[in-house]
Amino acid sequence: MSDSANSSCIIIAIAGASASGKSLIASTVHRELRDQVGSDDISIISEDCYYKDQSHLDFATRTQTNYDHPNSMDRDLLLEHLRALKAGKSVDIPQYSYVEHTRMKEVTHFTPKKVIILEGILLLTDERVRNELSLSLFVDAPLDICFIRRLKRDMEERGRSLESVIEQYRKTVRPMFLQFIEPSKQYADIIIPRGGKNRIAINMLKAQILHLLGRK
């Protein structure tokens, strides 16, 4: 938890392995807190939106992107947006296409919120990002379970082949988790075991957010 966090804009980061349950926790907290916080005052931002633009590269080169390495992220833009939102300014968040392996032309106009939930695998690897957070969490789920979830997701939602998902996991996903993502767990204020269906952890997170807002 950063001392520099602005109490008028609470930024919660949920990090962890790919397919560990980050998005499920974020969406559950968002859905269940809307009535208490206000539906227009809590929202989610995915770190995936801040993958670097690769439109200057040919498609074959883009398909080789290591999405699990910190260098794949446009950290400067993410920081610029977080600081702008904390200052009460709106931002235009880029959208990323995993089909084209680059940013889309469309952006999402995002207005300041009382509570912003960030979710992504690499959020805690950058000290500058950590310094902008009000609270940080790491979802700790077994890697074999994460792989099964990722395999199902990538084949069903992203049209990937079984072979390509396995190859990516072997070459980049698992090695980068061990090198960058798992070590970043030490920076989390809260570690959530058992993935995205940990009801006790979700309730604790909701209570902490309300506490940060000065509500019971």
Curated annotation (Swiss-Prot):
Q: What top-level branch of life does the organism fall under?
A: Bacteria
Q: Which InterPro entries match?
A: P-loop_NTPase (IPR027417), PRK/URK (IPR006083), Uridine_kinase (IPR026008), Uridine_kinase-like (IPR000764)
Q: What class of enzyme is it?
A: transferase
Its Gene Ontology cellular component terms are: cytoplasm
Record Gene3D superfamilies: P-loop containing nucleotide triphosphate hydrolases
Catalysed reactions listed for this entry: uridine + ATP = UMP + ADP + H(+); cytidine + ATP = CMP + ADP + H(+)
Q: Does the keyword Cytoplasm apply?
A: yes
Q: Which Pfam families match?
A: PRK
List the coiled-coil residues. none
Q: Entry's HAMAP family?
A: Uridine_kinase (MF_00551)
> Which family does the entry's similarity section mention?
Belongs to the uridine kinase family.
Please report the name of this protein according to its UniProt entry. Answer: Uridine kinase
Q: Which organism is it from?
A: Mannheimia succiniciproducens (strain KCTC 0769BP / MBEL55E)
